[in-house]
Design a protein with these regions (language model features):
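Transmembrane alpha-helical segments and their membrane-water interfaces
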Residues: 56-61, 89-143, 345-351, 355
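A membrane-periplasm/extracellular boundary helix in multi-pass inner-membrane enzymes
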Residues: 139-145, 244-287, 306, 310
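Hydrophobic alpha-helical transmembrane segments
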Residues: 81, 121-171
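TM-adjacent membrane-interface loops and short helices in multi-pass inner/ER membrane proteins
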Residues: 289-325, 339-342
Length: 411
């Protein structure tokens, strides 16, 4: 009887570890995407997240199946401490920033210590949670488009950088309030943030895209009309085929033909007056040697960036005195953190993603991280980093027979 009682207690402890860790990492993931319901926490979301994860780690030590036994953690933690401390110093952060960074460090430490199979299970859970949220948000958004009277309130975020009408299940950017079809961002700040997050989550679920939560993620991705997310999604498809040692030349030809048909059709359908043409293709037009959709930064910021590159300040970067709306991508990161910060970030990524189980998987994670850095410039956002880390540590693909047996077990 005593043994039976002990087994029950062990099960309860392991379940508590799962609840605390999942809740903590979910909070970190969503906190980095800034949904409206986490705005009150602001940049303090790592505090409750870190406490939950710390609790999970302490309890896990007392169980037979300790979740946090990965021994490749020292170099990644040192790399994170180096880049995060550098960024705090360069951007003249107050003492609160250093306190919050202690909790960020604890969160990253838990990620590096977590067993690979536990991370894979969590990523599937995360996709289900995100899919569940969007499963409610997407229908509500379409009901709004056909005139359903939702109650909305004015919402402002980030010193008036963002202004919305918040309908609670989704938000509408005030700049697109009267648009025929506003881009979908659900409860998050930007369509691009949602699109990129959905794409990266789908990259961890390759071969399982027919499951309900992944279908929902794909539908959400398509309705963000994010050019960057679309491009990354196509790259993900071919990277995953390459990682799994599958022939993709034929698929590449088919996809090019399919995309070409859609593009040509959009120019003729309704004389070019359609969503695909107006929200995506028009941004690919080239004027005066510049692509219309190449608008990651404003002209004023571009001028400031060129001046920075011509001065010695580019070595360490400099703080932006008056951050503007509409600036993102690698230029913003280099402006704020300089060449030294960029090198430290690269070292951190090499240290944390460099434990190779499969060279192709690791290479694909680096390629996606580079694309994300160029487009968004937020390499430490949990919504980005978690997926890169999971992808980099994928095991080599199983032989066909073993792979089929594994799929049958999962079903």
């Amino acid at each position: 009887m005593r043994l039976k009682k002990l087994d029950i207690q062990t099960i309860k402890k392991e379940k508590l570890v799962q609840i605390c860790f999942y809740a903590g990492i979910l909070l970190a993931f969503f906190g980095s995407l800034h949904p409206w319901f986490l705005w009150p926490l602001g940049t303090l979301y790592p505090l409750p997240s870190g406490l939950l994860i710390g609790t999970a780690m302490l309890i896990s030590k007392t169980t037979k199946d300790n979740w946090f036994t990965n021994d490749h953690f020292l170099a990644p933690v040192m790399g994170y401490v180096a880049i995060s401390t550098y960024m705090l110093v360069i951007n003249e952060t107050n003492i609160n920033g250093y306190i919050v960074n202690v909790f960020h460090t604890a969160i990253f430490y838990s990620i590096f210590r977590l067993k690979t199979e536990k991370m894979e299970a969590f990523m599937t859970f995360l996709c289900k949670v995100m899919g569940g949220l969007l499963l409610v948000s997407i229908p509500a958004f379409f009901l709004y488009l056909v005139g359903f009277p939702f109650v909305g309130v004015d919402a402002v975020y980030g010193d008036d950088l963002y202004s919305y009408t918040n309908y609670f299940l989704f938000m509408i950017d005030d700049r697109t309030l009267w648009a025929f079809f506003p881009r979908f961002s659900s409860v998050f700040l930007e369509p691009g943030h949602l699109g990129t997050a959905a794409t990266l989550l789908l990259s961890t679920q390759f071969g399982k895209w027919k499951r309900w939560y992944n279908i929902v993620l794909l539908v959400a991705l398509l309705h963000t009309f994010s050019l960057a997310a679309y491009v990354i999604y196509v790259v993900v498809i071919f990277l995953k085929l390459w990682v799994q040692r599958k022939q993709f030349i034929g698929k590449l030809i088919m996809m090019v033909a399919f995309i070409s048909t859609i593009v040509v059709g959009s120019f003729f359908y309704n004389n070019g007056e359609n969503l695909l043409h107006d929200l995506i293709l028009i941004r690919l037009e080239v004027e005066d040697g510049e692509m219309a959709g190449n608008n990651r930064v404003t002209e004023d910021f571009d001028t400031d960036f060129e001046k920075l590159c011509e001065s010695s300040a580019v070595i360490f970067g400099k703080k932006r005195e008056n951050p503007e709306f509409g600036n993102s991508g690698y230029k913003v990161f280099i402006y704020e953190n300089g060449i030294v910060g960029t090198i430290l970030m690269l070292i951190f990524y090499i240290a944390s993603l460099g434990k190779i189980r499969d060279r192709r998987a690791t290479a694909s994670a680096f390629i996606l991280a580079l694309l994300g850095f160029i487009v968004r410039g937020y390499p430490l956002w949990y919504s980005n980093y978690l997926t890169y880390y999971d992808l980099a540590h994928e095991a080599p693909p199983l032989p066909d027979d073993a792979g089929k047996k594994k799929k049958e077990k999962e079903k």
